[in-house]
Amino acid sequence: MNYYSINLAKAHLLHYPCPLNINFLWNYGFLLGIVFFIQILKGVLLALVILQKLSYAYYSVQHILRAIMDGWCFRYMHATGASFVFILTYLHILRGLNYSYSYLPLSWISGLMIFLISIVTAFYGYVLPWGQMSFWNTTVITNLLYLFRTCFMDCGGYLVSDPTLKRFFVFIYFPFIALCQSLFGILPLSHPDNAITVDRYATPLHIVPEWYFLPFYAMLKTIPNKTAGLLVMLASLQILFLLAEQRNLTTLIHFKFAFGAREYSVPTICYMSSMLIWIGCQLPQILHFIWSFIYYIILF
């Protein structure tokens, strides 16, 4: 038995350690726990009635909206709750960056693992409504996995189809993994084009993911090579893990405090991320590519 883990849990439940200058920014973790629990509860209820078969998935979502009592409320609460999860997560990460929480590697990396699991869960949720935007978003994202042949073929290959839908539905337990990780969903898309039945022969003018994936989507649009785009996207997440090692980089710490970089880093990240969200939802144009490239260089 791991007595250290038990004592650590008891210490947090009975005598929670917190700084003297505690303020409202320390509420984000608690709010995330509440929203996450509500998401799991609604996700389980919606999973009871949705049919993950190619011919019925879209119509089962419409059945939830129109035929089931208060089904529309559960569906839209689930979609809105997913946005709240990512809003609170991004604010939580920014708070950690501002207060140099990366100096606590165990807590920092544990939180980033929850963030990555949430991203994977939201991606699986793209497929479930099986609307027009769901289908084409999934086609774009799964094609990025062509470097990993086994995963690529398991996701349905170049043609997203019924096996893809069923295999992704199997991974709806991912929120429970994130919940366990946070202790020691499955979301429908809200884009208007997703309320259209899938048409394999009509590619949308502009494939738009949910807003919390738009910075990554802007990165993929900026870099023409799929492999390079995927590597840069992974690097943008990996760099957060590397922040846990900055305690050993004394030169970087001296630079931050000598030139006041700490005070300007978080506002800069907020501004760059906001601009990348805006660029990600725009039609692909040369000007947007240039600005996106500049913003990503500054962000890195």
From Swiss-Prot:
Binds 2 heme b groups non-covalently. Its cofactor is heme b. It is a multi-pass membrane protein. Heme b b562 binds at residue 78. GO terms for cellular component: mitochondrial inner membrane. GO terms for molecular function: metal ion binding; ubiquinol-cytochrome-c reductase activity. One of its GO terms (biological process) is mitochondrial electron transport, ubiquinol to cytochrome c. It is found in: Mitochondrion inner membrane. InterPro entries: Cyt_b/b6_C, Cyt_b/b6_N, Cytb/b6-like_sf, Di-haem_cyt_TM. Keywords: Electron transport, Heme, Iron, Membrane, Metal-binding, Mitochondrion, Mitochondrion inner membrane, Respiratory chain, Transmembrane, Transmembrane helix, Transport. Pfam families: Cytochrom_B_C, Cytochrome_B. Belongs to the cytochrome b family. Component of the ubiquinol-cytochrome c reductase complex (complex III or cytochrome b-c1 complex) that is part of the mitochondrial respiratory chain. The b-c1 complex mediates electron transfer from ubiquinol to cytochrome c. Contributes to the generation of a proton gradient across the mitochondrial membrane that is then used for ATP synthesis. Heme 1 (or BL or b562) is low-potential and absorbs at about 562 nm, and heme 2 (or BH or b566) is high-potential and absorbs at about 566 nm. This is Cytochrome b. The lineage of its organism: Eukaryota, Sar, Alveolata, Apicomplexa, Aconoidasida.
